[in-house]
Amino acid sequence: MVEKTKCETGGENRMRLLKKAAAVILAAAMAASLAACAAQKTEETTAATVETTAAETAESSTEAESSDGDTHIVVDHTGREVELPKEINRIVISSILPLPSVYCLFEGSAEKLVGIHPSSMAAAKNSILPQVVPDIVDVNTDFLQGGELNIEELLNLKPDVVFYNASNTDEYEKLAAAGIPAVGFATANWDYDCVETFENWVKLLGEVLGEEDKAAGIAEYGHQVYDEIQATLADAGEIEKPKVLILFNYANGVIKTSGDHFFGQYWIDATGGVNVAADLQGTPEINMEQIYEWDPDIIYITNFSPYQPEDLINNTIEGNDWSSVKAVKEGKVYKFPLGMYRWFPPASDTPLVLKWLATKNQPELFADIDMEQEVRDYYKRFYNVELTDEDIDQIFNPSSEASGLSK
């Protein structure tokens, strides 16, 4: 406590007193901010101090301990400060679909993972991930029903924290109303650069879990692969670039592509192609007339769609006639592989996706890349997994069931 003094003490003592009082107020305000428990507005001076402290925390992007040491504060990809227990034992990953695989490889286990999205589970069951983390297939998915968050089921899982897609504001509001700590992981903060997105996901995981980034080598290698591909394309000078169409989500008569400001644009630009849907934004719905007009040279189908290349090539999809499309006539229809996770969004296999797409979009420039050997070497280096021939076949010919949808 600061002792009360008389006015006659003198200027020097008065200044000393004011400094002491300011120090006490500052310390109290910082403790209140870091504990995140000030529910009411304090006086103006204290509020200003708290605001300054929060800004400094956000700038440093580091964890801050609360006064009692049982919790810590992290700044997620929405810019929000989230108070979390230091000891996190029960984690739910909801609307950020690739993150369960990234988390499992970061932790080397699914032991603390108590809930994931059904679509994440569909991918996991048809991936190589269970070979590395067998218990991933036993994680609960019941808290999401018909794509909707069931708060009652979620509360039954007793999560210490929920990881969600930072753009899903409705989900955040439901979690906040239920008093569940929620950390937002972004997909759009880095211009849909898949390597940078992955890199920032594992960085935030490290801050939340208070652990070292175990996946830093993957991001570093991803940047290296990207730079090597750009150098090869630049050295080639003026090259003919194929017109590329990505069927991002094609099911039940609805065709959605990947336009600008989405991952497809990054993949195509990075590997020597031209996105036919570049004038569209996000994942717009398109029709066959538009596809006939574009007449793409190459078509890629993601694992969010149950359709396979042969469905287009054999023209067996009811209501859609693919027979006149150039890519179909020339047999240049490819399914994105599925390794630890679907290869279209950011994930731990991202460096391999860059190489695979480069060999398809510019086969002459990247003829020296043996993708089967690349995958074997990568899995041994980063996951310590020796892939069999059967594993390789599974990765490059993923099941339709991985989409979680029916044809």
PLM region spans:
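Short, Lys/Arg-enriched N-terminal segments with co-localized hydrophobic residues
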Residues: M1-R14
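C-terminal motif of bacterial Sec signal peptides marking the signal peptidase cleavage site
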Residues: S33-A36
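A short, structured surface patch at a secondary-structure boundary
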Residues: S94-E153, V161
